[in-house]
A protein has these predicted regions:
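Non-catalytic substrate-recognition and accessory regions of acyl/acetyltransferase enzymes
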Residues: 1-158
């Protein structure tokens, strides 16, 4: 299912905070540090793990690293970056096999991109993962071609 990916230069699981964090270098037209984070959130009275990714930047006020999910790098390697991000899902479920991952883009266009990836690879995703979408105030089983505000992914029970 997944094409070429970048190697991770850092993988970190912080048990006390329940956060899983990956760092890699996008090596397109420039070298851009990228980060992927799975962090616990609560939405509609349910616990999920937000799957966030973007450029790894330093907060000018605190000096701490954070994920900038609004900048568009336009680095010429979008497929490799996207495949690298997707590759972290199976690693996440090794730590949290019963969890549900929440996917929502920082804007509508990005959420559509994530949905189109699932549409394209649905035949390869569906045997392993349960995918649901939130629309019109309800969580429903994923149907290719349907618009959703956000997506939820969990590992299928074996």
């Amino acid at each position: 299912m997944i094409g070429e990916t970048y190697p991770f230069i850092s993988e970190e699981y912080t048990q006390g905070s329940d956060v899983l964090f990956f760092v890699f270098l996008s090596q397109g037209e420039r070298v851009v540090p990228k980060a992927i984070g799975f962090t616990p959130i609560e939405k509609h009275n349910s616990k999920f793990y937000n799957w966030g990714f973007g450029d790894l930047v330093t907060n000018e006020k605190t000096g701490e690293f954070e994920i900038d999910d609004e900048t568009e790098s336009n680095n010429g390697d979008v497929k490799t970056v996207f495949y690298t991000v997707v590759s972290t899902l199976s690693k996440f479920f090794e730590f949290h096999p019963e969890a549900t991952v929440h996917i929502e883009g920082s804007n509508t266009q990005r959420t559509r991109i994530y949905k189109s990836f699932i549409n394209r690879y649905w035949g390869q995703i569906e045997p392993y993962y349960d995918v649901r979408g939130y629309a019109s105030g309800k969580i429903r089983d994923f149907e290719p071609g349907t618009e959703y505000e956000y997506l939820l992914i969990s590992r299928k029970k074996t």
